[in-house]
Amino acid sequence: MRSKRPLISMSQVQLVYKSMFCQNVISAVWCEPPAWLALNARAADDEADSTEDPVYHRPVLQPEVLRLLKPKSGSLIVDATCGGGGHTEALLESGADVLALDQDPDAVQHVTERLAYFGRRVIVRQANFRHAGCVLDELGIRTVGGILLDLGVSSRQLENAARGFSFVRNGPLDMRMDPTTSLTAATIVNQYSEEQLTQLFRELGEEPAARRIASLIVKMRRTSPFRETLPLARAIEKLIGRHGRQHPATQVFQALRMEVNDELGALEQGLRVLVARLAPGARIAVISFHSLEDRIVKNFFRDHGREWLDKPEWPAPQRNPDYDLKLVTPKPMEPSDDEQRANPRSRSAKLRVAEKIK
């Protein structure tokens, strides 16, 4: 058993809190999602494309994360998207202490129970990582020894019909990672204009048939608003048809999920907040699954990894005020062929790592 050296006082490491703080953006209160009768319309292959862990997806690129993040015994690592706790557990087993964050109360409950045997070495909080600064301030922590962001959606979220992420199991058209927020997929589908839906499906979903799908949705909702996942998925399938293994609603559902949870906005803000708390010599590792996410990470690391800035109209190069990172992975790392075969959901994963230099 690893050392269980106290990280901070016991009053700071309680897993259930009675207070709300940082303007109610952080909560450790567990809420059971409402029950929903799932109607399995197709094989889970449509969505999972593989046999998955029945609770949470297997952590992607785990050996690479440990090798490149270099967690030190006794240092504090922030697992900013702990999900099912796979990466969190590996970091704890390496000897590091972990602050585990997730905006999903289901994940918080699961990780709290799964990792309870690590005692004081793990702190679990419900919070979007864009608010990590509030959590660290509340705990009295100024800097951390490493950061991990795994931006993938979990199998449990996809497979729980009541959460509304699935296009093969009927449920409310919800898609909120944090059920205390107000915007749902139903609101978007039923209230966004045709032009807004087209832009959303094209930009976040990278859907070639974005305009046709948006037009169909607007036409259909005039007579009957969309309230459940399967009617929407079936309407898209009827319009587009099936080509290959991927369900034709995949990219539209992805776009809706990203919009509901402001995933790109959270990533842009979260990177700034988290890197500001990284100790010199410590590293941040980000696993992304979407080209837009990877572009944000790539550009952030590039902009913070340039010591000098230069423009043709300048008389001389100027120091970059944001220079505080060194690239560890000039090109993103991807899962091995073996990992992709064992876990097809890892296929689009990209890992980028940078080190704080000051």
Please provide the spans of the model-predicted regions.
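S-adenosyl-L-methionine-dependent methyltransferase catalytic core, i.e., the SAM/SAH-binding region
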Residues: 2-5, 12-17, 21-358
